[in-house]
């Protein structure tokens, strides 16, 4: 079975990177000229996943604007945590409740993936 939907956790406050993350959400920080979020989305596209749910809270407008201004060739739905940050489990549950799928792969945008790891994820899906 192939997993069709990815969840990306983008709601965090990024406190460990203060003061940088006071004005820029951690997923939008750049490494080698590309944001961590864009790198994560590109990895998901390489995995041939069809849809992304992305949660937001801290500086959510910046993340929403970033997604709207990019031409990612994948369906991306933004789910805001609301008035209170839901933490990891709550954020995941909130995104799952907006989806009709049963199976997901979860990403943290601040994890950088090598091509070797992409191959390993593809192998894992063959066992799923």
Name each region found by the language model.
Residues 19-20:
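Short acidic/histidine- and often glycine-rich active-site loop of Leloir-type glycosyltransferases
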Residues 1-8, 16, 34-108, 112, ...:
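Conserved N-terminal catalytic core of the sugar/cofactor nucleotidyltransferase
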Residues 13:
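Conserved SAM/SAH-binding loop
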Residues 23, 101-102, 127:
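Structured helix-beta-strand junction loops
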Residues 23-38:
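Short catalytic helix/loop segments, enriched in acidic residues and glycine
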Residues 116-128:
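Conserved donor-nucleotide/metal-binding helix-loop-beta segment in metal-dependent transferases, i.e.
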């Amino acid at each position: 079975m192939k997993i069709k939907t990815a969840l990306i956790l983008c709601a965090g406050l990024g406190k460990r990177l203060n003061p940088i993350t006071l004005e820029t959400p951690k997923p939008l920080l750049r490494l080698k000229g590309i944001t961590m979020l864009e790198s994560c989305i590109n990895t998901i596209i390489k995995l041939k996943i069809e849809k992304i749910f992305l949660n937001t809270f801290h500086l959510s407008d910046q993340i929403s604007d970033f997604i709207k201004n990019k031409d990612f060739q994948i369906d991306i739905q933004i789910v805001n945590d609301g008035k209170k940050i839901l933490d990891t489990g709550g954020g995941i549950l909130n995104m799952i409740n907006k989806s009709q799928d049963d199976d997901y792969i979860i990403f943290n945008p601040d994890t950088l993936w090598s091509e070797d790891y992409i191959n390993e994820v593809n192998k894992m899906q063959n066992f799923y």
